[in-house]
């Protein structure tokens, strides 16, 4: 007789009864990213912008009807604070009873009061030490007693395109506090136009570009490297192009080296006193090649620089700089555009003298300029 074989094998992923089971396999899930996150996470906070509640005309009418428009209850209602917006910040220094937080200026702008929420959920009142709308940075202070971790800064000049970048913050608000996203450095120095909350242009900023996800609420939080060092402060994302084309993976952070110089001065003075030439400028690349020859009379070998469009009464005028002069060097170092010119100037202090190399009617000249304050420091 022919015998049929029967299998007694248990289906893969099942126990002897045929039920699906899970395996408890021990693996080392620790990675450079998770270690870096653990190093910094307790220094990252949510920043709550509190503003006075706007009681409408309806409330005033009802109060008038019931004869208590001037009552204390009405006054307390008009003074009630509510959450206007939320962002992120990072604790970077403890000094005695005070801890200092860096965040974005636009996160705290317009606030009547501020709160921070620590990584463990504890709420603390915060006060503004100083703000700077040009770089979109602000420094806050809180009681240092609950602070267990302080972040350290890395050298943003040494980052490389393609290296891992991690963004930490509260995307969409404190409900998602201490969220981590991972990407790479897409560009080390990207020049973008900046504007304030009213949409008015405030100049240009040189920022780090990353594809680590950055959303509303991430503003003010840290961009870190795999060593757990802060290499930038997340500031903005590009969500659409000029033609309304949807854009993904384009976030920007203020480089740590610039952050450190700004926040140190904010703690010291409460504001930034920037040196200036006393001119308005435009990139040479914005001028057509025909105009470069006919109006600026530039040699064809000159491909980078910043064109003076107007000269105010001040140091540049005293030094002999004129409209349509093309600045190509500061202190002997070539500059390719207005952003690099400003970067070179901002390394100096008000009252310093810098050597400006420029072309006037096609001839290269140099002049010494004593720097003055900018018209607006905030």
Give the positions of each predicted feature.
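C-terminal recognition in membrane/secretory proteostasis and scaffolding
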Residues: 1-12, 35, 226-227, 261-378
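Gly/Ser-enriched beta-turn/beta-hairpin loop segments
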Residues: 56-61, 68-84, 119, 131-135, ...
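Terminal peptide-recognition signature
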Residues: 42-47, 65, 89, 99-103, ...
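Active-site loop architecture of trypsin-fold serine endopeptidases
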Residues: 56-57, 111-114, 148, 168-182, ...
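N-terminal activation segment of mature serine protease catalytic domains
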Residues: 2-61, 70-75, 87-88, 264, ...
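Gly/Ser-rich catalytic serine loop of serine hydrolases
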Residues: 85-88, 151-155, 207-224, 308-319
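Conserved active-site neighborhood of the chymotrypsin/trypsin-like protease fold
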Residues: 84-85, 91-175, 329, 333-339, ...
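A conserved glycine-rich beta-strand in the N-terminal activation segment of trypsin-fold
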Residues: 27-35, 72-100, 122-127, 150-152, ...
């Amino acid at each position: 007789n022919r015998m049929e074989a029967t299998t007694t094998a248990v289906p893969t992923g099942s126990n002897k009864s045929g039920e699906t089971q899970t395996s408890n396999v021990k693996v080392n899930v620790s990675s450079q990213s998770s270690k870096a996150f653990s190093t910094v996470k307790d220094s990252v906070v949510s920043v709550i912008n509190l503003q006075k509640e706007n009681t409408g005309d309806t409330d005033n009418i009802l109060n008038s009807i019931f004869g208590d428009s001037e009552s204390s209850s009405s006054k307390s209602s008009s003074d009630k604070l509510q959450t206007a917006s939320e962002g992120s910040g990072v604790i970077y220094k403890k000094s005695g009873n005070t801890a200092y937080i860096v965040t974005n200026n636009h996160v705290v702008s317009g606030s009547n009061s501020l709160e921070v929420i620590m990584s463990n959920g504890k709420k603390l009142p915060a006060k503004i030490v100083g703000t700077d709308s040009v770089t979109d940075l602000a420094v806050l202070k809180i009681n240092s007693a609950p602070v267990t971790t302080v972040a350290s800064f890395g050298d943003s000049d040494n980052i490389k395109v393609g290296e891992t970048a991690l963004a930490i913050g509260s995307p969409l608000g404190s409900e998602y506090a201490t969220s981590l996203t991972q990407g790479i450095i897409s560009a080390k120095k990207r020049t973008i136009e900046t504007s304030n909350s009213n949409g008015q242009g405030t100049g240009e900023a040189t920022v780090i570009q990353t594809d680590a996800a950055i959303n509303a609420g991430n503003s003010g939080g840290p961009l870190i490297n795999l060593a757990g060092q802060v290499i930038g402060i997340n500031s903005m994302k590009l969500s659409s192009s000029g033609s309304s084309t949807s854009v993904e993976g384009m976030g920007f952070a203020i480089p740590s080296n610039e952050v450190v110089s700004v926040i140190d001065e904010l703690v010291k003075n409460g504001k930034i006193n920037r040196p200036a030439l006393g001119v308005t400028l435009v990139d040479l690349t914005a001028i057509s090649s025909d105009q470069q020859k006919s109006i600026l009379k530039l040699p064809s070998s000159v491909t980078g620089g910043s064109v003076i469009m107007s000269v105010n009464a001040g140091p540049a005028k005293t030094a002999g700089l004129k409209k349509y002069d093309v600045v190509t060097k500061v202190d002997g170092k070539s500059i390719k555009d207005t952003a690099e010119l400003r970067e070179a100037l901002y390394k100096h202090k008000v009252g310093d003298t810098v050597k400006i190399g420029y072309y006037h009617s096609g001839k290269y000249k140099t002049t010494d300029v004593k720097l003055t304050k900018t018209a607006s420091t905030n």
